[in-house]
């Protein structure tokens, strides 16, 4: 006996057999993304600074300062010397101030200015001479001079004033001598600027 199994035809196509096993539903995959810890570059601590930001002086530290002072009431016939170092009484902030706090110093520049206070009818001049080793007691040359009726200015750098090496604070570095050939009336004043360096604090 022949058994005929009927198959259902829909729209001219055979209907596929229903699969007895259902397709397994894929399990959801949970991805946990961990945040990457950012690595901070260590800060470089500046030399000479502590945690509070204050400057910590290191051994042998120094300082640079500029001083301006004047020598007033110069007569047309005045003469004298300005000694730069502990003998500089015209600038106590330098001689009795900074020099007391360090063991060594050097003056790297000096600017000598003449401020005229004489009338145009006066005559004469004030000669000056640089003594880089403090050996002269009086003016030996009158080549360099300021006329008393007009202002003048002269600058000396370190190589001229014995300022390339350190000096003990107990010794003077250099000297400027001056002498006028005018009358006894007031001729003007000197305005002096010095640039200094200090080394090895006490």
From Swiss-Prot:
Biased composition (Low complexity): 25-36, 50-60
InterPro entries tied to this protein: Luteo_coat
Record remark on domains: The N-terminus like those of many plant virus capsid proteins is highly basic. These regions may be involved in protein-RNA interaction.
Domain of life of the organism encoding this protein: Viruses
Stretches the record annotates as Disordered: 1-64
Name of the protein described by the UniProt record: Major capsid protein
Location relative to the cell: Virion
Pfam families given in the database record: Luteo_coat
GO molecular function annotation: structural molecule activity
Signal peptide range in chain numbering: none
Mitochondrion as UniProt keyword: no
């Amino acid at each position: 006996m022949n058994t005929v199994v009927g198959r259902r035809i829909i729209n001219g196509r055979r209907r596929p057999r229903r699969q007895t096993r259902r397709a397994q539903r894929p399990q959801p995959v949970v991805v946990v993304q961990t945040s990457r810890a950012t690595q901070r570059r260590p800060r470089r601590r500046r030399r000479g600074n502590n945690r509070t930001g204050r400057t910590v002086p290191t051994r042998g530290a120094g300082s640079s300062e500029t001083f301006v002072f004047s020598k007033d009431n110069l007569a047309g016939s005045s003469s004298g010397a300005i000694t730069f170092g502990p003998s500089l009484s015209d600038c106590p902030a330098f001689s009795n101030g900074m020099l007391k706090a360090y063991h060594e110093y050097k003056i790297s520049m000096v600017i000598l200015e003449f401020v005229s206070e004489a009338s145009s009818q006066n005559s004469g001049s004030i000669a000056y001479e640089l003594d880089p080793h403090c050996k002269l007691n009086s003016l030996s040359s009158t080549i360099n001079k300021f006329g008393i009726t007009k202002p003048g200015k002269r600058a000396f750098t370190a190589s001229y004033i014995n300022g390339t090496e350190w000096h003990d604070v107990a010794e003077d570095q250099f000297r400027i001598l001056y002498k006028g050939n005018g009358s006894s009336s007031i001729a003007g004043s000197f305005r002096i600027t010095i640039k200094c360096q200090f080394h090895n604090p006490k």
